[in-house]
UniProtKB/Swiss-Prot annotation:
It is found in: Cell membrane. One of its GO terms (cellular component) is plasma membrane. The chain crosses the membrane at residues 6-26, 38-58, 68-88, 100-120. The keyword Cell membrane applies. The keyword Membrane applies. InterPro entries: FluC. Fluoride-specific ion channel. Important for reducing fluoride concentration in the cell, thus reducing its toxicity. This is Fluoride-specific ion channel FluC. One of its GO terms (biological process) is cellular detoxification of fluoride. It catalyses: fluoride(in) = fluoride(out). Na(+) is not transported, but it plays an essential structural role and its presence is essential for fluoride channel function.
């Protein structure tokens, strides 16, 4: 593992996490709907899609930029961006059933794990 690459992911991830913290905190909850969370998940998904769209359409994006922006910043901003990109890739590749399974598995698993963590924290 290259320490320079690890540093890029670390700095990008920290920056993304701080952005998530700030954006989630400044936006109000609207009728119990977490607007800030929706914003950061949507923003991270858009940014990751944009980055990999640039690569897909032929722009030479360096490995360092991909690590800092994609893995680091978008990962720190929201891990949801990776899930969204992977689902989009499955759809783009015509793997509709797998994409649907990916959506249900991720959404149901994460909701279940939030519930499980909540219940276990109570003990």
């Amino acid at each position: 593992m290259d320490l320079r690459e690890v540093a890029l992911v670390l700095i990008g991830g920290g920056t993304g996490a701080v952005a998530r913290y700030y954006l989630s905190g400044v936006l109000p909850v609207y009728r119990s709907f977490p607007v800030g969370t929706l914003l950061v998940n949507s923003l991270a998904s858009f940014l990751l899609g944009y980055l990999y769209g640039l690569i897909f359409w032929g722009l030479d994006v360096s490995r360092e930029s991909r690590l800092f922006l994609g893995t680091g910043f978008c990962g720190g901003l929201s891990t949801f961006s990776t899930f969204s990109y992977e689902t989009f890739s499955l759809i783009r590749e015509g793997e509709y059933l797998t994409a649907l399974l990916n959506i249900f598995a991720n959404v149901l698993a994460t909701i279940f794990l939030v519930f499980l963590g909540f219940v276990l924290a109570r003990r």
